[in-house]
Amino acid sequence: MSTEGAKPSEMLIAACRSNNVDMLEEVVHQQEGDGVSFINNARDSLGNDCVHVCTKYGSLECLDWLLDISGVNLNNRCRMTGDTPLHFAVMFIKKDQETALRMVEMLMEVGADPLLTNNDGFRPIDLVPGDFHDVFASALEGPAPALQYSADVVADDDDEEEGSGESDEE
């Protein structure tokens, strides 16, 4: 693929699409200022960011490289469908189950939210074909689902109250 005359953002997307880590690194390191903003703001012609493109094309090495960068947005939504990178990773099962599962695991390890729905109201797990549901369901469980309940947890700082674990009785 020729990148001659291409804009840096186009080269970045091309690197993600073709799983070319060397090109990805080179383009990001050539940018002045905040590389994270450059990565998060680059889009393909359909409005997909770098993480979306990696998961759409099964670009494991580029995805791994991007996920090592603090601040890369894991939960951006595709402008057309509302799909997150986790949705794209799950849909990759049609091409390669092993790669799809690995991408889901990678995204979950760094905090992608499996509870986000796309424009049709589907979570990533809802898009998994029945034959693979159990395998992907366990991969999509992780620290992120617990976050939805964290607001329901109430701290009890009053050690005098019943149920505090301390007792005046002996």
UniProtKB/Swiss-Prot annotation:
GO cellular component, one term: cytoplasm
PROSITE patterns with a match to the protein in the record: ANK_REP_REGION, ANK_REPEAT
PANTHER family according to UniProt: ANKYRIN REPEAT-CONTAINING PROTEIN C105.02C, CYCLIN-DEPENDENT KINASE INHIBITOR 2C-RELATED
Any one Gene Ontology BP term: endocytosis
Region (Disordered): 150-170
Subcellular location: Cytoplasm; Nucleus
Top-level lineage group: Eukaryota
Record-linked InterPro entries: Ank_repeat_dom-contain_49 (IPR051637), Ankyrin_rpt (IPR002110), Ankyrin_rpt-contain_sf (IPR036770)
The protein's name in its UniProt record: Ankyrin repeat-containing protein C105.02c
SUPFAM superfamilies xrefs: Ankyrin repeat
Biased composition (Acidic residues): 154-170
Keywords: ANK repeat, Cytoplasm, Nucleus, Repeat
Signal peptide annotation: none
Single GO MF descriptor: protein sequestering activity
SMART domains for this protein: ANK
Classification via Pfam families: Ank_2
Keyword Metal-binding: no
ANK repeats (start-end): 46-76, 81-116
